[in-house]
Structures are given as C-alpha cells and as structure tokens.
Amino acid sequence: MSKIKLISSDNEEFVVDQLIAERSMLIKNMLEDVGEINVPIPLPNVSSNVLRKVLEWCEHHKNDLYSGTEEESDIRLKKSTDIDEWDRKFMAVDQEMLFEIVLASNYLDIKPLLDTGCKTVANMIRGKSPEDIRKTFNIPNDFTPEEEEQIRKENEWAEDR
C-alpha cells in the first residue's frame, strides 16, 4: 500500500498508509481526481495534535465498511446515540479537543467520526436543564427572566414529564 504525506496547519508532516488517509472523503476524492500525489497534502484547518487523534481513529476503523452513501441502516444508526466502547474511550478528551475533532472530521469529510463526535456531544447534554448545559459549555445566559419564561411557555410541549 502506498504512503501519503499530510501536513498539518502547524507544519508537522504525517506519513500514513493511503488506506488510512482515504477514510477522509476529502483526501480520497483528491487522490481520485489527480491520481498519485508525490507532494505532501496540506491540511490548513487541522493542527498536528488534532490530526494525530483523527489518524488514530482512522487507523482503528481502517477496515470498517463505509460507502459514503446513506442507507436505511445508516440512518437508523445515526438516530441512535449509542457509541461503541473504543470510540467512547477515544472521545474521552477535554471539550476543546472534542470540538476540534468534530471540526476536523467535518473538514476532512469523515462522516462516521463526525457522527461519533456529535453523538458524544448529544450524550453530554441529554437530560440536562438549560442551566446545566450552559455550565457544561461555558455559555453565558443572555436572556432576561421574562424572555426565559416566554421561551419555557412556548416550548412546554417539548418538556419531559
């Protein structure tokens, strides 16, 4: 298997198997469009510490089947917020790294990793009050008490009872 060179935003070079790099649809499409590339591929939106984590995920999932198309079973899996044990441990990082992984997987077009990151965030807010969510993500409350009450009334139907 041939090797691909990737350059992170902070100019660190990563040499990876093409199979692993092609978990990224961005890279896979680029290679299909231009053929074999003998120069490093710059990834200006991904720092080395984040790219290292993303490549670790790609290495672990290199043999997973992923067609890039949404089928009925894929849609059912996306609706679930269940995450397998390895991915749950992989995503057990600080919030900044978690969000950087989500952004990188979106940029690199690695849908299964993006889904896993989004499910992780969804699980972080499941069952929490708006106040708890604000604390978790350091979000200031910019609503007046009157605005909050109005929003609660308008969304009463969505409350768990």
Curated annotation (Swiss-Prot):
Region: Interaction with the F-box domain of F-box proteins; residue ranges are 102-161
An example GO biological process term is: resolution of meiotic recombination intermediates
Q: Where in the cell is it found?
A: Cytoplasm; Nucleus
The observed outcome of changing residue 139 to N is: Causes early cell cycle arrest. Prevents binding to mcs2
**Annotated effect of mutating residue 102 to A:** Causes G2 delay
A GO cellular component entry from the record? nucleus
Gene3D superfamilies linked:
Potassium Channel Kv1.1, Chain A
SMART domains in the cross-refs: Skp1
TM ranges: none
Record-level Gene Ontology MF annotations: cullin family protein binding
| Sorted UniProt keywords | Cell cycle, Cell division, Cytoplasm, DNA damage, Mitosis, Nucleus, Ubl conjugation pathway
InterPro entries the record matches: SKP1, SKP1-like, SKP1-like_dim_sf, SKP1/BTB/POZ_sf, Skp1_comp_dimer, Skp1_comp_POZ
- Function per UniProt: Required for cig2 degradation in the G2 and M phases of the cell cycle. Together with pof6, essential for septum processing and cell separation. Involved in mitotic progression, essential for the execution of anaphase B; required for coordinated structural alterations of mitotic spindles and segregation of nuclear membrane structures at anaphase. Involved in the DNA damage checkpoint pathway and maintenance of genome integrity. Component of the RAVE complex which is required for stable assembly of the vacuolar ATPase complex V-ATPase.
Family per similarity comment: Belongs to the SKP1 family.
- Tell me how this protein assembles: Essential component of the E3 ubiquitin ligase Skp1-Cullin-1-F-box (SCF) complex. Interacts with cul1, fbh1, mcs2, pip1, pof1, pof2, pof3, pof4, pof5, pof6, pof7, pof8, pof9, pof10, pof11, pof12, pof13, pof14, pop1, pop2 and tfb3. Forms a complex with pof6 and sip1. Component of the RAVE complex composed of rav1, rav2 and skp1.
The protein's name in its UniProt record: Suppressor of kinetochore protein 1
Q: Which organism is it from?
A: Schizosaccharomyces pombe (strain 972 / ATCC 24843)
